């Protein structure tokens, strides 16, 4: 397989993105990546990340490619799961406690911290609005976090997300209760389950 073939395969797999680190892992040298980028007039969207000229930048995908420790949570994850129809007002993500996120704490970004014991609980990959896979908390973890931090959310967003989840045929109540116990919100979650299901 030629260098061009390898890079084209990576670009196809990542929906028009060329990620230098993935190319290097596949055996392509950085100078070869740079040459390919120049020859194909690709646009740089972040350090080591390029896109074809007919691809819209996907902020969630790019941010996560640059920062592998982040997991989309809060309003961002709730929106991606379709529990609210209004797009998130800011990007919310969770990182391990002690992680230095000052390089990504910018406008419209909310950083949350979680202990290692619960950080990865309920993670999954789903498509962003642009169709790229991003790592987020599953619906059940989102609902537990929402209930735990209810004062941080607008009442309409809070109620809509809870109602959407509780009326969904794809909810997993045993998983919801398992997470609720681990996150210390079992009683609050059970109140919603008993009333709405």
Task: Tell me what each language-model feature is.
Residues 3-10:
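Short helix->loop/beta-hairpin flanking segments within DNA-binding domains
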Residues 6, 16-22, 45, 49-197:
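Nucleic-acid-binding surface
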Residues 25:
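Short, surface-exposed ligand-recognition loops at beta-strand->loop->(often short) alpha-helix junctions
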Residues 35-40:
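Basic amphipathic alpha-helical segments that dock to polyanions
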């Amino acid at each position: 397989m030629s260098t061009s073939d390898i890079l084209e395969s990576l670009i196809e797999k990542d929906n028009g993105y060329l990620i230098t680190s993935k190319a290097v892992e596949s055996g392509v040298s950085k100078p070869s990546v740079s040459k390919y980028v120049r020859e194909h007039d690709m646009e740089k969207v972040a350090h080591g990340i390029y896109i074809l000229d007919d691809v819209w930048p996907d902020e969630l995908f790019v941010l996560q490619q640059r920062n592998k420790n982040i997991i989309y949570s809060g309003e961002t994850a709730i929106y991606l799961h379709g529990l609210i129809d209004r797009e998130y007002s800011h990007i919310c993500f969770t990182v391990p406690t002690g992680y230095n996120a000052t390089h990504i704490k910018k406008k419209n970004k909310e950083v949350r911290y979680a202990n290692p014991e619960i950080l990865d609980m309920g993670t999954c990959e789903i498509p962003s609005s642009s169709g790229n896979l991003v790592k987020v908390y599953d619906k059940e973890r989102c609902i537990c976090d929402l209930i735990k931090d209810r004062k941080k959310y607008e009442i309409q967003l809070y109620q809509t997300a809870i109602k959407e989840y509780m009326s969904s045929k794809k909810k997993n109540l045993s998983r919801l209760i398992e997470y609720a116990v681990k996150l210390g919100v079992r009683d609050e979650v059970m109140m919603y389950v008993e009333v709405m299901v």
